[in-house]
Amino acid sequence: MAINAYSWAKDGEKNLSPSFKVREFRCSDNTDPIFIDSELVEILQKIRNHFGKPVNITSGFRTASKNAAIKNAAKFSQHLYGKAADIWISGVTVEQIAAYAETLLPNRGGIGRYPKEGHADRTHGWVHIDTRAAKSRWVS
């Protein structure tokens, strides 16, 4: 798969798949360009199709400065390369999302669980999904 560069201003409304647009992957600092891995989009579309509900992306591509400002963010986060997304789905648990993601990435990729339970500062839990070559799993 390929990592493609897009302009938030120019390509923001461009469809990457039936359910996802470029703007959904933009860094919260609104910097151009936005890097997005086409394989990540395919995985997220499969998750959307499986659960039949919208997938909310809370963090897609991140600039180095934005990543550095995030508490406990990995120094070489896959978000920096457009290969990661943090997602949640209304009415679907973190465990359900992660379990299905595991069927899509059984031997590689990153799947991180960030449950709401035990974290008063979180309005909902989320799952980190990335397309790295090695396999990595964690709970935070």
Residue map of PLM features:
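A generic short-segment signal for beta-strand/edge and adjacent turn/coil regions
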Residues: 26, 50-58, 91-96
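Solvent-exposed, flexible loop/coil residues
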Residues: 7-12, 20, 65, 70, ...
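Extended, low-complexity, intrinsically disordered C-terminal regulatory tails
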Residues: 41-72
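Extracytoplasmic cell-surface/polysaccharide-interacting catalytic and binding patches
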Residues: 1-50, 122, 132-140
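Catalytic cores and adjacent binding grooves of peptidoglycan-active enzymes
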Residues: 75-76, 80-140
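Amphipathic alpha-helical interface surfaces
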Residues: 36-43, 53, 66, 83, ...
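N-terminal start-of-chain detector that recognizes signal peptides
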Residues: 28-30, 56-62, 101
